[in-house]
Amino acid sequence: MPKEASSPECYTTSTSSNEISEKPGMWRNFKDSFKPPVPIDDIENGSISSTQLKGGQNVPLQQSLKKRQLQMIALGGCVGSGLLVASGAALRNGPASLLIAWFIVSTFLYCTMQCLAELSSTFPVSGSFAVYSIKFIDPSWGTAMGYNYALFWVVVMPLELVASSMTIKFWPSNINTSVWVAVFYVLIIGTNLFGGTRAFGETEFVASVIKLLGIVGFNILAIVLICGGGDQGYIGGKNWHPPFTTGVKGVISVLLTATYSLAGTELVGLTSAEAAGDARKVLPKAIKQVLWRILIFYLLTLTLVGFLVPASDPQLIGGGSGASASPFVIAIREGGIKGLPSVFNVVVLVALLAIANSAVYGFSRTILALAEQGVAPSIFKYVDRQGRPLAGIATSAIVGLLSFVSASKQQEQVFDWLVALSGLSTFFTWGSINAAHIRFRIAMKVQGRSLDELPYKANTGVLGAYYGLIMNVAVLALQFWLAVWPIGGKPDATYFFKQYLAAVLVLAVYVIHKVATRNWKFMVDYKDMDLDSGRSDIDIDILKQELEEEREAYKRQPWYYKFYQFWC
């Protein structure tokens, strides 16, 4: 029989009875929102009456992310500098290198997201995959993965702001780029600090709509330009020659940029603890959108970019004075369409700022989960009445000051360092999601549990998890080879640590945790795994009955409905 999960302490967003009876104004409500949530126990013992409550929840984090917001986060949430800016440097390796690398990464990302859909719909917990690694792999490894993911997001915020300062140079101006960075910095921190989860969700929704409309519009325009609708006349496939400029090593190097551009896709799993509605239905539905984003907004778009911009174009990042330009903007500008490059550059800026906004959310929720697991300072556990992890947001704000490096002449070198560090850490995150899914499935079998009690089963099955894990490990190994023997150069210690610093940090945290806890077991035993705590449905029998009814209803549906439900 499954273990019965203990009930978490309940909280409400109310203030004290005296404060409520006075009907405080906007300023007092604002101040009170930073106070701790009030435990429901205070209601039961009479210190606060139930009529004074505006609403409550079972955990300090607010379940206020709507279905449409989750779907747009999955569909367009991670479209940022990796695709719109860093792809310029990747294109210098040739258009075929660009497309092959993105396709390879996309295949094992899809498998990874299916694993995450199964785990997050079953266990919609704060911290998501960091907690899954602790539960199903090893506490030390899970801790290392948590810090790895927290580091990824805390670095991404200044990275995106640096990218925005590079992009804004498109418009000639006497205004120092640091001024724009300051404006964007205040906007992002203010959104997370004063708007909370609702503001994050709505901001991501609007930004994703703008990004996706911009990319769809670019794709339509690109087809017209390729067919001869621009100043360059008929372009065809001439820019696809040569398809490779740096050989096999070029493809491998682009894998890092491709991973960085797709990193953050897993963020939708991190929202599981704050999703409104039934997590077992909402999350898988949102995660299924990833397939269409990969096909339409990445592979198709990058193919068209390869047709329009030659790999030898000096305007690409690292190629000269036009280092801040997006390859998308270059393509439109070379087409001779006045005004439109500026419009698309606005889309690029929106994308960069939206990712920076996600970075604050991602770091604050990950470090909160680590604190709840007892492996991060307890100050990070503080969540106020609006569901804001204040210490995590404050830490993001402090590290975000690195974005003012945009005033330095070395900003592009900093950009390259941050891209490399962030991109490599993603392989560890994705690989751990696959490993956690594999071990979870094995534990289910060892403990005699049925897969019928899972609210959602991964379309790719456990074989997809094995494929995802193997590919992540393989790419890490190839990146190690490239770090030791770089393209067109000799072995260099500085270059190696620039490319492989994330692996060093993961190993360091893993060893430190092992030594600190003196837990020398390599992995959690299958028979000892906790398969019940954190479940969205405590009564397994009722869940099985509901799932059986849903399966019977599904069988009666026409084939096109089944096709749609499987893929969408």
Curated annotation (Swiss-Prot):
Superkingdom of the organism of origin: Eukaryota
Residue ranges with Polar residues bias: 9-19
Protein name: Amino-acid permease GAP6
One MF annotation (Gene Ontology) recorded for this entry: amino acid transmembrane transporter activity
Regions crossing the membrane: 70-90, 96-116, 151-171, 175-195, 206-226, 250-270, 290-310, 343-363, 389-409, 418-438, 468-488, 493-513
Protein location: Cell membrane
Record's keyword terms, sorted: Amino-acid transport, Cell membrane, Glycoprotein, Membrane, Transmembrane, Transmembrane helix, Transport
Induction behaviour: Expression is under control of the CSY1 amino-acid sensor. Expression is also regulated by PLC1 and GCN4. Expression is induced during development of rat catheter biofilm.
GO biological process, one term: amino acid transmembrane transport
Region Disordered, residue ranges: 1-29
UniProt membrane topology term: Multi-pass membrane protein
Residues listed as glycosylation sites in the UniProt record: 45
